[in-house]
Amino acid sequence: MTEFVFPLTGVEKARLRAGLEAAFTIPIIDDVEDFVWEALFHYVKNIPLPDPITQGRTKQLFDAVASDGRGWSLKTLVSRNFTVGSSFEFVIQRANIFQKAAQLGFPEGLNSSSDIANLGAALIRHWNEKHQRDCIAQNVTDPPIVILLKNRLRKRLAYVEFAYPILQEADYRWRWSREGGFGLQGWKDEQVHLKWYPSGTQLFQVFQMPENAYYFELEWQKATLSNFVENVIRTLAE
Protein backbone atom coordinates (compact mmCIF):
# COMPACT_ATOMS: atom_id res chain seq x y z
CA MET A 1 0.00 0.00 0.00
CA THR A 2 0.93 3.67 -0.23
CA GLU A 3 1.68 6.15 2.52
CA PHE A 4 0.14 6.47 5.97
CA VAL A 5 -3.62 7.01 5.86
CA PHE A 6 -5.42 9.54 8.06
CA PRO A 7 -8.99 8.63 9.14
CA LEU A 8 -11.86 11.08 9.32
CA THR A 9 -13.53 11.70 12.67
CA GLY A 10 -17.19 10.87 13.10
CA VAL A 11 -18.10 14.56 12.90
CA GLU A 12 -16.05 14.98 9.72
CA LYS A 13 -17.75 12.00 8.09
CA ALA A 14 -21.17 13.49 8.85
CA ARG A 15 -20.12 16.88 7.46
CA LEU A 16 -18.67 15.24 4.34
CA ARG A 17 -21.88 13.38 3.60
CA ALA A 18 -24.09 16.39 4.32
CA GLY A 19 -21.96 18.73 2.23
CA LEU A 20 -21.86 16.38 -0.74
CA GLU A 21 -25.59 15.73 -0.65
CA ALA A 22 -26.22 19.48 -0.55
CA ALA A 23 -23.84 20.14 -3.44
CA PHE A 24 -25.17 17.39 -5.70
CA THR A 25 -28.72 18.65 -5.09
CA ILE A 26 -27.91 22.13 -6.43
CA PRO A 27 -28.99 22.30 -10.10
CA ILE A 28 -26.39 24.90 -11.10
CA ILE A 29 -23.50 22.63 -10.03
CA ASP A 30 -22.59 19.95 -12.58
CA ASP A 31 -20.22 18.02 -10.31
CA VAL A 32 -18.18 18.17 -7.14
CA GLU A 33 -14.69 19.03 -8.29
CA ASP A 34 -12.24 21.93 -8.40
CA PHE A 35 -13.46 24.86 -6.25
CA VAL A 36 -16.70 23.11 -5.23
CA TRP A 37 -14.67 20.28 -3.71
CA GLU A 38 -12.27 22.75 -2.11
CA ALA A 39 -15.15 24.64 -0.52
CA LEU A 40 -16.77 21.45 0.78
CA PHE A 41 -13.47 20.29 2.22
CA HIS A 42 -13.14 23.53 4.18
CA TYR A 43 -16.58 22.76 5.61
CA VAL A 44 -15.57 19.19 6.48
CA LYS A 45 -12.45 20.32 8.34
CA ASN A 46 -14.19 23.42 9.78
CA ILE A 47 -11.57 25.88 8.53
CA PRO A 48 -12.19 29.34 7.03
CA LEU A 49 -12.81 29.41 3.28
CA PRO A 50 -11.09 32.24 1.37
CA ASP A 51 -13.35 34.19 -0.99
CA PRO A 52 -12.18 33.33 -4.54
CA ILE A 53 -13.52 36.62 -5.90
CA THR A 54 -11.90 39.04 -3.46
CA GLN A 55 -8.87 36.92 -2.51
CA GLY A 56 -8.30 35.09 -5.77
CA ARG A 57 -7.03 31.56 -6.34
CA THR A 58 -3.52 30.26 -6.88
CA LYS A 59 -1.85 27.31 -8.59
CA GLN A 60 -0.01 26.40 -5.42
CA LEU A 61 0.01 22.80 -4.24
CA PHE A 62 -2.19 23.10 -1.18
CA ASP A 63 -5.86 23.87 -1.78
CA ALA A 64 -6.79 24.13 1.90
CA VAL A 65 -4.52 25.37 4.68
CA ALA A 66 -5.21 25.39 8.43
CA SER A 67 -3.59 27.68 10.97
CA ASP A 68 -1.88 24.71 12.68
CA GLY A 69 0.37 24.01 9.67
CA ARG A 70 -1.73 21.37 7.93
CA GLY A 71 -2.12 21.88 4.20
CA TRP A 72 -4.13 19.58 1.97
CA SER A 73 -3.75 18.94 -1.74
CA LEU A 74 -7.25 18.06 -2.95
CA LYS A 75 -8.16 15.79 -5.86
CA THR A 76 -11.31 14.19 -7.25
CA LEU A 77 -11.58 11.26 -9.63
CA VAL A 78 -14.39 9.37 -11.30
CA SER A 79 -13.68 5.67 -10.81
CA ARG A 80 -15.33 2.37 -11.65
CA ASN A 81 -13.17 0.34 -9.30
CA PHE A 82 -13.14 1.03 -5.56
CA THR A 83 -11.70 -2.31 -4.45
CA VAL A 84 -8.86 -2.43 -1.96
CA GLY A 85 -5.52 -2.50 -3.77
CA SER A 86 -6.87 -1.09 -7.02
CA SER A 87 -4.81 1.70 -8.55
CA PHE A 88 -5.78 5.23 -9.52
CA GLU A 89 -3.65 8.04 -10.85
CA PHE A 90 -3.69 11.73 -11.72
CA VAL A 91 -1.35 14.38 -13.08
CA ILE A 92 0.61 16.19 -10.38
CA GLN A 93 2.88 18.33 -12.53
CA ARG A 94 4.20 19.18 -15.96
CA ALA A 95 7.85 18.25 -15.63
CA ASN A 96 10.00 19.44 -18.53
CA ILE A 97 13.21 17.97 -17.17
CA PHE A 98 15.01 18.24 -20.51
CA GLN A 99 14.66 22.00 -20.50
CA LYS A 100 15.54 22.32 -16.81
CA ALA A 101 18.31 19.70 -16.69
CA ALA A 102 21.07 22.04 -15.47
CA GLN A 103 18.84 23.49 -12.77
CA LEU A 104 18.11 19.95 -11.58
CA GLY A 105 21.77 19.00 -11.25
CA PHE A 106 22.56 17.71 -14.74
CA PRO A 107 24.66 20.41 -16.47
CA GLU A 108 25.48 18.07 -19.36
CA GLY A 109 21.79 18.00 -20.25
CA LEU A 110 19.15 15.29 -20.44
CA ASN A 111 17.24 13.64 -23.27
CA SER A 112 15.23 10.48 -23.81
CA SER A 113 18.47 8.51 -24.32
CA SER A 114 20.00 9.62 -21.01
CA ASP A 115 20.66 7.19 -18.19
CA ILE A 116 17.28 6.16 -16.84
CA ALA A 117 18.34 6.70 -13.22
CA ASN A 118 19.24 10.31 -14.03
CA LEU A 119 15.87 10.88 -15.66
CA GLY A 120 14.12 9.51 -12.60
CA ALA A 121 16.23 11.59 -10.23
CA ALA A 122 15.48 14.72 -12.25
CA LEU A 123 11.74 14.04 -12.07
CA ILE A 124 11.82 13.63 -8.30
CA ARG A 125 13.92 16.78 -7.87
CA HIS A 126 11.56 18.72 -10.13
CA TRP A 127 8.55 17.67 -8.05
CA ASN A 128 10.27 18.15 -4.70
CA GLU A 129 11.24 21.70 -5.63
CA LYS A 130 7.59 22.63 -6.07
CA HIS A 131 6.53 20.71 -2.97
CA GLN A 132 9.11 22.44 -0.77
CA ARG A 133 8.57 25.87 -2.35
CA ASP A 134 4.82 25.75 -1.79
CA CYS A 135 5.18 24.41 1.75
CA ILE A 136 7.25 27.47 2.59
CA ALA A 137 5.02 29.93 0.73
CA GLN A 138 1.83 28.54 2.29
CA ASN A 139 3.26 27.94 5.79
CA VAL A 140 2.56 24.21 5.59
CA THR A 141 4.45 21.83 7.87
CA ASP A 142 2.07 18.85 7.71
CA PRO A 143 1.09 18.11 4.07
CA PRO A 144 -1.57 15.43 3.42
CA ILE A 145 -3.23 14.72 0.08
CA VAL A 146 -6.95 13.95 -0.12
CA ILE A 147 -8.70 12.12 -2.94
CA LEU A 148 -12.47 11.90 -3.35
CA LEU A 149 -13.42 9.03 -5.67
CA LYS A 150 -16.88 8.98 -7.25
CA ASN A 151 -18.72 6.48 -9.37
CA ARG A 152 -20.47 7.57 -12.57
CA LEU A 153 -23.80 8.33 -10.86
CA ARG A 154 -22.13 10.08 -7.90
CA LYS A 155 -24.02 7.82 -5.48
CA ARG A 156 -21.10 5.67 -4.34
CA LEU A 157 -17.97 7.41 -3.12
CA ALA A 158 -14.74 6.91 -1.23
CA TYR A 159 -12.54 9.33 0.68
CA VAL A 160 -8.88 8.74 1.38
CA GLU A 161 -6.31 11.01 3.01
CA PHE A 162 -2.63 10.11 2.69
CA ALA A 163 0.49 11.64 4.18
CA TYR A 164 2.20 13.56 1.38
CA PRO A 165 5.90 14.06 2.11
CA ILE A 166 8.55 14.86 -0.48
CA LEU A 167 9.76 11.93 -2.58
CA GLN A 168 13.03 10.12 -1.86
CA GLU A 169 15.24 9.36 -4.87
CA ALA A 170 16.65 6.21 -3.27
CA ASP A 171 13.17 4.66 -2.94
CA TYR A 172 12.59 4.36 -6.69
CA ARG A 173 13.70 2.10 -9.52
CA TRP A 174 13.01 3.25 -13.05
CA ARG A 175 12.11 1.50 -16.28
CA TRP A 176 10.49 2.35 -19.59
CA SER A 177 6.94 1.04 -20.01
CA ARG A 178 8.03 -0.29 -23.40
CA GLU A 179 11.01 -0.02 -25.69
CA GLY A 180 11.47 3.28 -27.45
CA GLY A 181 11.02 5.52 -24.44
CA PHE A 182 7.23 5.83 -24.50
CA GLY A 183 6.64 6.25 -20.77
CA LEU A 184 8.94 6.20 -17.76
CA GLN A 185 7.77 4.35 -14.65
CA GLY A 186 8.98 4.84 -11.10
CA TRP A 187 8.70 1.63 -9.07
CA LYS A 188 8.61 1.46 -5.28
CA ASP A 189 7.79 -1.60 -3.16
CA GLU A 190 7.09 -3.64 -6.32
CA GLN A 191 4.43 -1.21 -7.51
CA VAL A 192 4.36 1.66 -9.98
CA HIS A 193 4.05 4.96 -8.11
CA LEU A 194 5.14 7.48 -10.75
CA LYS A 195 4.64 7.75 -14.51
CA TRP A 196 6.12 10.31 -16.87
CA TYR A 197 5.54 10.80 -20.58
CA PRO A 198 8.28 12.79 -22.38
CA SER A 199 5.98 13.81 -25.24
CA GLY A 200 3.70 15.80 -22.95
CA THR A 201 6.03 16.17 -19.95
CA GLN A 202 3.18 15.10 -17.66
CA LEU A 203 4.13 13.49 -14.35
CA PHE A 204 1.47 11.20 -12.87
CA GLN A 205 1.34 9.86 -9.34
CA VAL A 206 -0.22 6.46 -8.77
CA PHE A 207 -1.94 5.41 -5.55
CA GLN A 208 -3.40 2.13 -4.35
CA MET A 209 -6.74 2.03 -2.58
CA PRO A 210 -6.10 1.32 1.11
CA GLU A 211 -8.14 -0.96 3.36
CA ASN A 212 -9.17 1.88 5.65
CA ALA A 213 -10.53 4.29 3.06
CA TYR A 214 -13.92 5.73 3.97
CA TYR A 215 -16.52 4.18 1.68
CA PHE A 216 -20.05 5.56 1.69
CA GLU A 217 -23.20 5.91 -0.39
CA LEU A 218 -25.40 8.96 -0.92
CA GLU A 219 -29.06 9.43 -1.78
CA TRP A 220 -29.80 12.74 -3.45
CA GLN A 221 -31.99 14.23 -6.15
CA LYS A 222 -31.44 17.43 -8.13
CA ALA A 223 -33.67 20.31 -7.09
CA THR A 224 -35.55 22.09 -9.84
CA LEU A 225 -33.90 25.30 -10.94
CA SER A 226 -36.87 27.50 -10.06
CA ASN A 227 -37.30 25.99 -6.58
CA PHE A 228 -33.59 26.32 -5.89
CA VAL A 229 -33.42 29.99 -6.86
CA GLU A 230 -36.62 30.87 -5.02
CA ASN A 231 -35.46 29.11 -1.84
CA VAL A 232 -32.09 30.86 -1.90
CA ILE A 233 -33.67 34.29 -2.39
CA ARG A 234 -36.20 33.57 0.36
CA THR A 235 -33.45 32.49 2.75
CA LEU A 236 -31.34 35.56 2.03
CA ALA A 237 -34.33 37.82 2.68
CA GLU A 238 -35.02 36.35 6.12
Range-by-range predicted roles:
Residues 58-71:
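Short acidic loop-to-beta-strand element that houses the catalytic metal-binding Asp/Glu
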